[in-house]
Swiss-Prot record:
It comes from Hahella chejuensis (strain KCTC 2396). ATP binds at residues 23-24, 65, 68-70, 131-133, 174, 184, 221. The gene is ruvB. HAMAP family: DNA_HJ_migration_RuvB (MF_00016). Disulfide bonds: none annotated. Residues 4-184 are annotated as: Large ATPase domain (RuvB-L). Homohexamer. Forms an RuvA(8)-RuvB(12)-Holliday junction (HJ) complex. HJ DNA is sandwiched between 2 RuvA tetramers; dsDNA enters through RuvA and exits via RuvB. An RuvB hexamer assembles on each DNA strand where it exits the tetramer. Each RuvB hexamer is contacted by two RuvA subunits (via domain III) on 2 adjacent RuvB subunits; this complex drives branch migration. In the full resolvosome a probable DNA-RuvA(4)-RuvB(12)-RuvC(2) complex forms which resolves the HJ. One of its GO terms (biological process) is DNA recombination. GO terms for cellular component: cytoplasm; Holliday junction resolvase complex. InterPro entries: AAA+_ATPase, AAA_lid_4, DNA_helicase_Holl-junc_RuvB, P-loop_NTPase, RuvB-like_N, RuvB_C, WH-like_DNA-bd_sf, WH_DNA-bd_sf. The lineage of its organism: Bacteria, Pseudomonadati, Pseudomonadota, Gammaproteobacteria, Oceanospirillales. This is Holliday junction branch migration complex subunit RuvB. DNA binds at residues 313, 318. The RuvA-RuvB-RuvC complex processes Holliday junction (HJ) DNA during genetic recombination and DNA repair, while the RuvA-RuvB complex plays an important role in the rescue of blocked DNA replication forks via replication fork reversal (RFR). RuvA specifically binds to HJ cruciform DNA, conferring on it an open structure. The RuvB hexamer acts as an ATP-dependent pump, pulling dsDNA into and through the RuvAB complex. RuvB forms 2 homohexamers on either side of HJ DNA bound by 1 or 2 RuvA tetramers; 4 subunits per hexamer contact DNA at a time. Belongs to the RuvB family.
Amino acid sequence: MIEADRIISPNATLQEDSQDRAIRPKRLEDYVGQPQVREQMEIFINAARGRQEALDHTLIFGPPGLGKTTLANIIANEMDVSIKTTSGPVLEKAGDLAALLTNLEPKDVLFIDEIHRLSAAVEEVLYPAMEDYQLDIMIGEGPAARSIKLDLPPFTLVGATTRAGLLTSPLRDRFGIVQRLEFYSVEDLRHIVARSASLLGVSIDDGGAHEIARRSRGTPRIANRLLRRVRDYAEVKADGAITNEVADKALNMLNVDLHGFDHMDRRLLLAVMEKFDGGPVGVESLAAAIGEEKGTIEDVVEPYLIQQGFLMRTPRGRVATQAAYNHFGLTMPE
């Protein structure tokens, strides 16, 4: 199974990108959750606007699905400027970046998603652009080649990444503002579900919103995806209104349990507990036992189970915790 097949995947599909655009908050006042980030960005943006300057370059990092792209667009809206959007893998050559930079208006936002995937050649062009608002361009080839400097308007680079540790130090050090997005609380997700339902014209009560929120793995993107699927269920099996009971039945049908685990999570935990006596078990043996690739287990399944305290990664292998045994109603071996 691949990540995109899972309803609780935090990664967006192309269809979801366009669907989510309609329900994304446009202003900080509509942005739910991340109170520290929201408070800080409000101060930084108001200060920059008061000085009539471009906002400092901003790095946003954290797990997928938490709203990095949304926050980048909010920054542009609050600064009342345009935003140009691209991603690290798309910028293959220095010329690709130069074309974007030379088309920016003063104070505009350039948003680079997956910025950790920029090539070294593109990064070299980015350094003087970020630091001095200058673009170094080579004209000609061989002995006749010469470098010219182009002045750029002051702009704001907003970089987003799920893997901040892969950023080079010179690039990371050039960001004046660094924000980490954390997983959302159930209460914040409940507000997000209720807001999205209102924008989508879906009838939902507090119980229904709470049921979806608590199974959304702390991730707004998953919450909005589950809301759409529960809406489908409500329209066919109920009267179109989402209550706690309707949400519970719909999510059970979708194999998403009370902790937001799907069949893949449960299969891994049960394999550790039942086939390997709770562990420790090596990831290769575990992969063979459940018929998944080692990389899928390490990158897709394990992180959330470890973060929630159901699985431990030790030098000797994976170990199921007491919480895992409690979840399945099993007795932990002595």
